């Protein structure tokens, strides 16, 4: 994905991991991009440097996705560097600890809801006023195929992502035709977080899908580029899930 497909677009991508791949794909296609991070400034700076290699303007900003004051400061900074925006990718999220429902603490439940649900709410609430009134805006919410498939011992995570899906549908009705809102729901994707945090046995089990492999971050970034581009202007309220057939298992 290179060229000028997104030339002139100003995009905001929250969170890292898949968000890094999305941000770099946007930059390759000519977009100016701002990314957010919580703690790893060095990694964010590396991503900015990678994006700048494509001759675009790139920025990073520290923002805790579930913190309202942080999000207000993010909006102020975006207004300062971009003026207005065209694309928001709500990617920041947390998976949570694997545990049966009887062992999920209230604090852990609240933590996941704060990041995965409230984070989408806050970014959308405070960044909507920044969308360019003369262009069709795009909001892309990153969910998970587990939001429809379910997963034992991850009720907090699947519930949070199910809420994101519902928010997408309501926002699509509320904001169209000026801003188009869609969900991208990845299946099992090979990310640094997965490879570092999960056992090799878990990773191998995740490959037990019709395509027989984990997806790549490129499989996800390609869809987000489509939705962010001029070719995504008849998508509204959609649930798009690159998952290698995982939903059938």
Q: What positions do the PLM features span?
A:
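Canonical Rossmann dinucleotide-binding motif of NAD(H)/NADP(H)-dependent dehydrogenases/reductases
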Residues: 3-34
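Short C-terminal tail/terminal secondary-structure segment
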Residues: 95-98, 149, 207, 225, ...
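Substrate-binding pocket helix/loop in short-chain dehydrogenase/reductase
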Residues: 99-101, 105-110, 139, 194, ...
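Active-site helix of classical SDR
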Residues: 124, 160, 168
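Alpha-helical segment proximal to the catalytic Tyr-Lys
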Residues: 129, 172-177, 233
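Residue(s) in the substrate-gating loop at a strand-loop-helix junction
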Residues: 144
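A glycine/serine/threonine-rich, flexible loop-to-helix segment
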Residues: 156, 186-209, 219
């Amino acid at each position: 994905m290179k060229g000028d497909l997104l030339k002139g677009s100003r995009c905001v991508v929250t969170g890292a991991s898949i968000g890094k791949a999305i941000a770099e794909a946007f930059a390759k296609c000519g977009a100016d991009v701002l990314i957010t991070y919580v703690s790893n400034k060095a990694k964010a700076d590396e991503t900015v440097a990678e994006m700048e290699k494509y001759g675009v303007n790139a920025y990073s900003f520290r923002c805790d996705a579930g913190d309202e004051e942080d999000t207000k400061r993010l909006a102020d900074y975006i207004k300062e560097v971009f003026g207005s925006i065209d694309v928001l990718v709500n990617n920041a999220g947390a998976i949570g600890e694997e545990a049966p429902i009887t062992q999920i603490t209230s604090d852990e439940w609240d933590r996941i809801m704060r990041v995965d649900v409230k984070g989408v709410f806050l970014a959308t609430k405070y960044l909507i006023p920044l969308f360019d009134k003369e262009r069709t805006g795009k909001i892309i919410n990153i969910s998970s195929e587990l939001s429809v498939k379910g997963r034992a011992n991850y009720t907090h995570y699947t519930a949070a992502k199910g809420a994101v899906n519902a928010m997408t549908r309501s926002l699509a009705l509320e904001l169209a035709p000026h801003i188009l809102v869609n969900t991208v729901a990845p299946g099992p994707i090979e990310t640094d977080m997965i490879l570092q945090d999960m056992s090799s046995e878990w990773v191998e089990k995740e490959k037990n899908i019709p395509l027989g492999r984990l997806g790549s971050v490129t499989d996800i970034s390609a869809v987000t580029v489509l939705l962010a581009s001029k070719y995504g202007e008849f998508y509204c309220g959609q649930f798009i899930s690159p998952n290698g057939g995982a939903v059938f298992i």
